[in-house]
Regions:
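Pre-P-loop entry segment of helicase/translocase ATPase cores
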Residues: 1-47
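ASCE P-loop NTPase helicase motor core
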Residues: 109, 149-249
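Conserved Walker A/P-loop ATP-binding site and its immediately adjacent core
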Residues: 76-97
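ATPase catalytic-site recognition across NTP-hydrolyzing enzymes
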Residues: 219-315
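Inter-Walker segment of RecA-like/P-loop motor cores
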Residues: 90-141
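Mg2+-dependent endonuclease catalytic cores in nucleic-acid-processing enzymes, primarily RNase H-like
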Residues: 48, 91, 96, 184-203, ...
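Walker A/P-loop
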Residues: 45-66
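Gly/Thr-rich phosphate-binding beta-strand-loop-beta motif of the actin/hexokinase/Hsp70
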Residues: 306-330
Length: 489
């Protein structure tokens, strides 16, 4: 006996034949999977993390996927989280448009019994809702949109999503986390990097599968007009082709034109590789542009200790907080940062012991200017206390924070960082940002005080104190640098 084929039993057929969207040109049209959506559909796992270029329709696809699963499966609950209420409402409009335009015969079979501004509840017991959090729900499907932005601007909300919303989804149900990159820190970065390293054939139901969708796979990202390329973009294309990515002239022209408006954000908004996506300037970041240049010029590498040149230290001394110490040498006009350490809960005596235990020949030790302040308990300044223990601090000049940040920006072009021994410092400088103002939805002018502040402060003291520690004269013939040595090549 032959059973008649019913296309409504085919999830892929339903996705491409029942639902309408408003496309990027503002026209209502029947939804059809593009290459990225099809690749995600064919390769999706229980837990999925998606790093992508802009305008590939990933959020739209996941919204329609969840709507379809709720319509054709009873007692399913789907939740969609966006980083702002306005964005959540926009995602819900896509779902509502798709539901309102399915064939009447289908909608009559599965009517919406509750149709509000943020939730659809269907007669089969399934529901789909949107918001900025899903704590307290029990979900079968969860989509977190632009999680990178949430991590960058709303770290408390990101933590709540991790501990609350993600825990509403049982193993074996479905999670989709997608975003463009927002710097080398935060939960989105950590989830992506861990998932990227995982063998895809050895994943458990709790492991995330990594998906990456670059700009150059999108067939519409090309122009027919020939445009001139700046030299740096030509060099970039050569680098891509050297790594096996082949792009044609029309794609190159599109990229060059797009880069004119996106500028430093191009690698974030339209990455070619997953590694590249993390290199773009972070919104609100003070030093990401300068640190990216350090990487491009290979100034984050092996930086050896030169025992013919003295070592200086720059400190951020916390009273009830972390202490950070940077060890650096001045070699010609280069600043070689050979080591950086940080910790909390230890006394000044402990840190002096750590510094003395290093095999370095020291010259000057820079500390914050408030090291001269006297403590009520002892009547002594911490400069006096350190001197009694055998280490003489020099207070840094009294410079306001923002001019000090400008000093760091101007000095970073001279800096070389040891890749292993200063990894924490490099990460801090790449992720040191302004504070986000939730009420005004903009960046404040002041820095965010978080785990990256201590190294960033120590670096600021280093840079504003160079006039104290730099040699009064320097002879490039006798003091070279890594640019002219085998280590810097």
């Amino acid at each position: 006996m032959t059973i008649a084929y019913n296309p409504l039993n085919d999830p892929l057929w339903r996705i491409e034949n029942l639902y309408h969207i408003v496309d990027k040109y503002g026209c209502k049209s029947l939804f059809k999977l593009n290459w990225a959506q099809k690749e995600l559909y064919n390769n999706m796992w229980y837990c999925n993390v998606i790093l992508k270029a802009r305008q590939l329709g990933i959020s739209t696809f996941v919204c329609l996927l969840f709507l379809d699963r709720c319509l054709f499966n009873p007692n399913m609950a789907a939740g969609i989280i966006a980083h702002t209420r306005e964005d959540a409402e926009q995602l819900f409009k896509r779902i509502k448009l798709a539901y309102d335009n399915i064939p009447n015969s289908v909608r009559k079979e599965i009517p919406a019994t509750n149709d509000s501004a943020r939730e659809l509840v269907f007669s089969n017991g399934s529901s789909i809702r949107v918001g900025t959090s899903m704590r307290g729900s029990t979900l079968n499907f969860l989509h977190i949109s632009e999680f990178g932005k949430i991590c960058a601007k709303y770290p408390d909300k990101a933590e709540e999503i991790l501990t609350g919303s993600l825990n509403t989804v049982a193993p074996g149900q479905y999670v989709f986390i997608e975003s463009t990159a927002e710097g080398k820190s935060g939960a989105f970065y950590d989830i992506c990097k861990k998932a990227e390293k995982q063998p895809k054939d050895a994943l458990t139901k709790l492991d995330f599968r990594f998906h990456f969708f670059p700009w150059w796979k999108e067939p519409t990202y090309r122009v027919g007009s020939i445009v001139p390329f700046p030299e740096e973009i030509n060099t970039y294309f050569d680098h891509l082709e050297g790594s096996g990515i082949k792009i044609d002239l029309e794609q190159k022209c599109w990229y060059a034109l797009k880069a004119q408006t996106q500028m430093d954000n191009m690698m974030r908004e339209y990455p070619s590789t997953s590694d590249e996506s993390w290199m773009s300037a972070i919104d609100g970041s003070y030093y990401s542009k300068q640190m990216n240049l350090c990487r491009l010029e290979n100034r984050i590498a092996f930086v050896p200790y030169d025992d013919t040149v003295p070592v200086h230290t720059a400190w951020d001394l916390g009273y009830n907080d972390s202490t950070a110490i940077i060890f650096f040498q001045l070699v010609g006009k280069e600043i070689h940062i050979i080591e950086a350490i940080e910790g909390s809960g230890e006394s000044l005596v402990h840190w002096l012991g750590v510094v003395k235990s290093k095999p370095y020949i020291y010259d000057k030790h820079i500390a914050p200017h408030d090291i001269l302040a006297h403590e009520y308990s002892t009547g002594m300044s911490r400069q006096d206390s350190a001197r009694k223990l055998g280490l003489s601090f020099i207070p840094s000049p009294r410079v306001e924070i923002l001019p000090g940040i400008d000093a760091v920006r101007s000095v970073l072009s001279r800096c070389w960082f040891d890749e292993k021994k200063t990894a924490g410092l490099v990460k801090a400088l790449e992720n040191y940002t302004k504070e986000w103002d939730d009420k005004r939805a903009c960046w404040r002018s002041s820095p965010l005080h978080n785990q990256y502040s201590h190294y960033a402060d120590a670096m600021r003291y280093l840079c504003i104190s160079l006039g104290i520690v730099e040699p009064k004269t320097y002879n490039p013939g006798t003091l070279g640098g890594l640019r002219s040595s085998p280590f810097g090549r």
